[in-house]
Amino acid sequence: MDVNPTLLFLKVPAQNAISTTFPYTGDPPYSHGTGTGYTMDTVNRTHQYSEKGKWTTNTETGAPQLNPIDGPLPEDNEPSGYAQTDCVLEAMAFLEESHPGIFENSCLETMEVVQQTRVDKLTQGRQTYDWTLKRNQPAATALANTIEVFRSNGLTANESGRLIDFLKDVMESMDKGEMEIITHFQRKRRVRDNMTKKMVTQRTIGKKKQRLNKRSYLIRALTLNTMTKDAERGKLKRRAIATPGMQIRGFVYFVETLARSICEKLEQSGLPVGGNEKKAKLANVVRKMMTNSQDTELSFTITGDNTKWNENQNPRMFLAMITYITRNQPEWFRNVLSIAPIMFSNKMARLGKGYMFESKSMKLRTQIPAEMLASIDLKYFNESTRKKIEKIRPLLIDGTASLSPGMMMGMFNMLSTVLGVSILNLGQKRYTKTTYWWDGLQSSDDFALIVNAPNHEGIEAGVDRFYRTCKLVGINMTKKKSYINRTGTCEFTSFFYRYGFVANFSMELPSFGVSGINESADMSIGVTVIKNNMMDNDLGPATAQMALQLFIKDYRYPYRCHRGDTQIQTRRSFELKKLWEQTRSKAGLLVSDGGPNPYNIRNLHIPEAGLKWELMDEDYQGRLCNPLNPFVSHKEIESVNNAVVMPAHGPAKSMEYDAVATTHSWIPKRNRSILNTSQRGILEDEQMYQKCCNLFEKFFPSSSYRRPVGISSMVEAMVSRARIDARIDFESGRIKKEEFAEIMKICSTIEELGRQK
């Protein structure tokens, strides 16, 4: 029977059909090769937006710097970064006037955070630029390396101290005449493989000491490493993102803490909230504007787009904002917060890996590292690359480009939101002093603007005034990409509003699926995704039931765990059939062991092992939940785990799911090939940390330490703890006299070894 597809929509309001218009299934595009070109684009574009600024030279590093602040007032609609300090300060003052005490209170909250934050806060986060090795590392490793270098250079660095003390070390390190660092180097040699008798390249890694003079150290400390942003949909060209080193991170963290605290108190801010809370905020603003405009006024909404938001922002402007926000605060606090923007005004962008050349005829490939771009003959490059390199050359120092203006992607999201909101705040009638007024929402670079006025001319005048006010602080609304509708229809941060929010369920489609890493986690994540979408995205009961059945079907294929009584033949079916036949209570088998599906939409919140526990055969229970089962490298699991799910649009989201420790929750073993690479030394360090931490936590179960605290003190702490515990256990009769004596002997031996060392 042919179905006329339009019939499907007869009962559906038009706006609910948005899910059918989203093409985001399948894998998003990833970038390959080098990001050098994209980074040069960013640097060149940023300078172009500020080209009429003043050039100066940094006295410490010799880097040429462009300062567009208080530059020419705009005469056309071209995007520009010439923010006017007095305008920014005035916007801040008005923001404070309409929210009495907001800055004061946020400063007090932040001051408390500054005094309490420990340095291990910096171990959170993903890849970080490790300035000692000049490449990205996991955050914890990069921090450890930084602290190790600080300590060997006579600074008091301590992994368990306060973050503020670490930042004092950072400041001191910048005053030092030279810094000695430990870097890795590779030796390659050709050797004959005994097994295959072929020639292979063997790499060995050595560590060597290297001295950096003040200039070289400062350049490294101020460097942001760049990469290509992956998995961006809907774009033809890739773009560069930056990751700062450990010197900058701590300062940025405190500035963002202050800005976050301010954003939480602003009704127009789309950050730091997300999801349903964000929708409620937006709905409130829309409701307010519509209620006020019922009879006499017109109300229009602009779904806005800004041109290169962060390339037109300026760290010097952020410094002015912070100076104003903290003006009545103690000197030390103002200093701590002003360092991040100062470092950003002097930042350097690392150009990445450089270019790869290959000659098809000679089968040769060669890498031109970024350091060589300053001197290499340009005849080897195509025209567009040649232009880029010519333009960037005056800015190059040691393979990094001086980049004073602009903010790089994703650095001061909260603080730039405060700036955006301060312009929205100026739309109140008491400030516009005319018949039109505006309000709206700002979330980083995304905004929605609602303008009310008695007639169309008023609306136009309002939009125009908003546009020009934005220009004065370095915000450039893209006229071509912003569109205006009657209030009630708009889009903000990929939420579509039409008389209320339209659930765009297709955005979540990519996160439905089975990743094939771990049977226990996959089952739990799968049902949690369905549960969450029923709560948040209007996933109706019938569709959810269908999604669930499809999910179970999907789940059985990668793990080859079709029901024990199925006819489907797979590699596992022989074993699973045998298990099925010898199990008395077949309903108790997990799906991954060929059991039936226990789920329906009523019990999605219960982990599968819990649902089936009462139904299981006793010996199956014993095998399934046995931490001593030797065939599984067993993972201790907290009751809640975090999974990363990828919606179609926007950043990867972290999602909590229940984790029950069964023999089906395993950790994949590390890929062996890493052991032959330059990463091997780092891997060994990491494993060493891991072992120390695990040991330490056995002694101090409530331990909040995540990393060793200077070797001697840690060992001493564990030894003394062992002695105390042993004495208590001996006196209460839990251990025998011989065991007690043995423990004491071991403790003395450890101390003796420590002394000999």
From Swiss-Prot:
Example of a GO MF term? RNA binding
Comp. bias regions, Polar residues? 55-64
Domain RdRp catalytic per the UniProt entry, residue ranges = 286-483
Question: What post-translational modification information does the record give?
Answer: Phosphorylated by host PRKCA.
* Region Disordered: start-end pairs: 50-82
Q: What class of enzyme is it?
A: transferase
| Catalytic reaction annotation | RNA(n) + a ribonucleoside 5'-triphosphate = RNA(n+1) + diphosphate
Pfam families per record: Flu_PB1
Q: Where is this region: Promoter-binding site?
A: 249-256
Q: Does the keyword Lipid metabolism apply?
A: no
The record's EC number reads 2.7.7.48
User: Sorted alphabetically, which keywords does the UniProt record give?
Assistant: Eukaryotic host gene expression shutoff by virus, Eukaryotic host transcription shutoff by virus, Host cytoplasm, Host gene expression shutoff by virus, Host nucleus, Host-virus interaction, Inhibition of host RNA polymerase II by virus, Nucleotide-binding, Nucleotidyltransferase, Phosphoprotein, RNA-directed RNA polymerase, Transferase, Viral RNA replication, Viral transcription
What's an example GO cellular component term for this entry? Answer: host cell nucleus
- GO BP: any one term: symbiont-mediated suppression of host mRNA transcription via inhibition of RNA polymerase II activity
Reported function: RNA-dependent RNA polymerase which is responsible for replication and transcription of virus RNA segments. The transcription of viral mRNAs occurs by a unique mechanism called cap-snatching. 5' methylated caps of cellular mRNAs are cleaved after 10-13 nucleotides by PA. In turn, these short capped RNAs are used as primers by PB1 for transcription of viral mRNAs. During virus replication, PB1 initiates RNA synthesis and copy vRNA into complementary RNA (cRNA) which in turn serves as a template for the production of more vRNAs.
The family line of this record is:
Belongs to the influenza viruses polymerase PB1 family.
Assembly notes = Influenza RNA polymerase is composed of three subunits: PB1, PB2 and PA. Interacts (via N-terminus) with PA (via C-terminus). Interacts (via C-terminus) with PB2 (via N-terminus); this interaction is essential for transcription initiation.
Instruction: Please report the name of this protein according to its UniProt entry.
Output: RNA-directed RNA polymerase catalytic subunit
The root-end lineage is:
Viruses, Riboviria, Orthornavirae, Negarnaviricota, Polyploviricotina
